[in-house]
Amino acid sequence: MGLDLYAYKVKNLESYNKYLSSCHNYNNYSAFLWTKYEKEVNKAYNRYCNWEAEHQNDPDYSLKENPYSYGINNFITEEEKNNENELATYREFAKTNCNYHEIESLYMRKHYWFIQYLYHKYDDKMIYRDGDIVKTFSGEQFIITKTDLKDIIDRLQRVIDASKNNLDTYYNDPLVYHSLSDEPLVNKDVMDREFPIYNEYHFAARMDWNYSYTTINSYLNDFKNVYSEMKDEELLVYVESW
């Protein structure tokens, strides 16, 4: 389970799949080049490190330039370089064509309730391997349609609606003491029902920010704003990062 989830918007599934395909082709070719020239690169890297070790105590070390370079471009042929550049150019074209851009307001940092929703949505494409949850679909990215987004909004709205009493008690009850680090929480039972834990082993240590009223309500409004401007064929793409 990643710590961060980055949200992107794309114009439709067809153009997005072409972008994924272009990324796949570029990555495969880069991996092929690395496998082919791995020994040469490692030897060059060792020469680079040896020179650094020999000269780092020289009085004029900061003025010297290491004569050795270990970049793979020093070894690939001109044809291979052109092939890689062509694949990189097509990848960037496909990215532009699908209008792949980040939606910063929907970035998630350790918001386990949302990753749980995504894991449940893709349950048939998740497997357990070596004690971890592994995605088996192309690109390892979660696709959210406009219909899915409406479902998320409805779930969050039910959580907020069920939490009004919590908010009233928090601000209006004179007998309730709050430290500076306190904040109002949503109704935990409703939150856990709308965004159930995907697997107890992976989500046993749920953090308090899963239940922050302010945070949940803020994301609800952000999702609503994105939904109101979203075309039917557009998609949200969430990328999990470690």
Regions found by a protein language model. Give the residues of each.
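Acidic (Asp/Glu-rich) sequence patches and key acidic residues
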Residues: M1-N225, E229-D232, W242
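Conserved GNAT acetyl-CoA-binding A-motif
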Residues: E234-V237
